[in-house]
Structures are given as C-alpha cells and as structure tokens.
C-alpha cells in the first residue's frame, strides 16, 4: 500500500511541532527544500486536513496548520540571488506562501551581492599615472574591461533588488559574494558576522 499524498511531509511537520511544544530549543531552524517542493511541503497539512475530516491525521494536520499560521511560532525566511530569474521565483513563492499556506514571511536573505568598488569610474591610465604605476596597453585594456564588468554587474544586481523592493516590500539581509573557489572557516565566519549584523539592525518588531 502507499501513503496518502503529503503524509511524509505532515510527519516532518509533526516532529517539528513536537520539538517546539516540548521546548527542545529556543529556536528551531528548518532548512526547507527548494521553492517548488517547499510550497508542497507546507501545503501538505491543508490537503490532509481537508481529506481526513476526523481522526488522528486530521488532528495532526490541524495542529500543524495552527503552528504554521501563528507568527509567534513560525516564520519563513526565503533566500535568493540578486538576479532576474531567482527574484521572479522568490516573488511567486512569497505570494503563494502567504495566500495558500497562510504563513508569515520574515526578512529575505540575498546571497552573493557584489558591493560596488569606489574608483572604477576613473580612467585606468589616469589612475595608473596618479599612482606612479606603469601599465602595458594590454593591461590597460584588461583592467578597463574588468572595471566595466564589475560596474555592470553591480548595476544589474541593484536594479533587481530595487524591483524586489517594489514588488515585495520585505526587509532584506544582504550577504556579499565571496570571491574564492572554496569557502574556508574565515569566509564562513565573515558571512555569519554579516548576517548577525543585519539581524541586529532589524526593526525589533520583526524579531519579536
């Protein structure tokens, strides 16, 4: 025999609810699946509550719905990249979660933002001359191209973040892109510090 659709997701929600009601921790963080499955996961309680109108399954589902719908107990923090397609997916997911699941959204985490670098608008040859540095023609071209790419990338990201702010007015927590092939402990510490600084700067009403 097969389990009813959503039963496994409901069991996970039930375990989370058990940990929460037992006071197992001050804060329980669930790293949910990607957007499409996350919506299905959180909708599972609604589907089962409607399908099973009585009994243990109905009780489990209604208790899970009560937990999800209470902003003092549950909030969803979405994460995205500052690019067009991920931003589109984030906006669709956010509205679906609010309207279909009834869960309250917390701040959005923006991964991989490129902070603007001052001075990129300066002519490469003028900057080299001011620094008393000699450059070959190839170096001038390469540095100019790199600076133009960095500026274009930053402008694109800022444009997408501005669109996100217009279409989904939620507070954001931005994490800078780490320019390395592999993150080490110092990189993780830096990102954690950035995230904590962003949380500390939030309106207290968002973290109550």
Name these PLM-found stretches:
Residues 172-174, 178, 182-208:
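C-terminal accessory extensions appended to soluble enzyme cores
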Residues 8-167:
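Conserved catalytic-core segment of NTP-binding enzymes
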Residues 1-5:
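Conserved phosphoryl-transfer catalytic core
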């Amino acid at each position: 025999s097969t389990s009813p659709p959503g039963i496994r997701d409901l069991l996970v929600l039930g375990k989370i609810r058990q940990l929460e009601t037992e006071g197992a921790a001050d804060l329980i963080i669930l790293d949910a699946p990607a957007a499409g499955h996350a919506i299905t996961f959180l909708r599972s309680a609604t589907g089962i509550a409607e399908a099973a109108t009585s009994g243990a399954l109905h009780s489990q589902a209604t208790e899970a719905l009560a937990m999800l719908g209470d902003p003092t107990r549950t909030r969803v923090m979405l994460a995205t990249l500052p690019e067009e397609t991920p931003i589109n997916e984030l906006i669709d997911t956010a509205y679906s979660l609010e309207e279909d699941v009834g869960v309250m959204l917390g701040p959005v985490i923006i991964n991989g933002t490129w902070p603007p670098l001052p001075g990129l608008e300066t002519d490469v040859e003028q900057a080299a001359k001011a620094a008393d540095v000699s450059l070959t023609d190839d170096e001038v071209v390469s540095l100019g191209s790199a600076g133009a790419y960095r500026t274009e990338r930053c402008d694109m990201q800022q444009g997408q973040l501005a669109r996100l702010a217009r279409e989904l007015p939620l507070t954001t927590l931005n994490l800078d892109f780490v320019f390395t092939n592999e993150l080490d402990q110092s990189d993780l510490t830096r990102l954690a510090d950035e995230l904590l600084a962003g949380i500390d700067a939030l309106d207290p009403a968002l973290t109550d």
